[in-house]
């Protein structure tokens, strides 16, 4: 099974994938995020954040209030299953999480918490 995915977040405010499938035979799953664009993170920063679909809006709202210096994430937010740091042009970050944190049948969303980005930069994550 493929237990990782490479995701790009660009200057057009888009991820290059909006559906991720995690094979339940994977013990851990890794997301490798890169930013191929030209804009710095204070203008067009991207992160990759995972929560349940039900928790997504709260994570985004509280993240915006937390500000750029906190990567637009509420510190130690228990609703966040996994997240990368916020990156800008030419930067990369990865996150690995335990697949045991996911439940079959639950709806998960991955998204960017930079203000205004989650409307476009979001997708599903499914355990199969």
Swiss-Prot record:
One of its GO terms (cellular component) is periplasmic space. Keywords: Copper, Disulfide bond, Electron transport, Metal-binding, Periplasm, Transport. Disulfide bonds join 3-26. One of its GO terms (molecular function) is electron transfer activity. Cu cation binds at residues 46, 112, 117, 121. SUPFAM superfamilies: Cupredoxins. CDD domains: Azurin_like. It is found in: Periplasm. Transmembrane segments: none annotated. Residues 1-128 form the Plastocyanin-like domain. PANTHER family: AURACYANIN-B (PTHR38439), OUTER MEMBRANE PROTEIN H.8 (PTHR38439:SF2). Transfers electrons from cytochrome c551 to cytochrome oxidase. NCBIfam families: azurin. This is Azurin. It comes from Pseudomonas aeruginosa. The lineage of its organism: Bacteria, Pseudomonadati, Pseudomonadota, Gammaproteobacteria, Pseudomonadales.
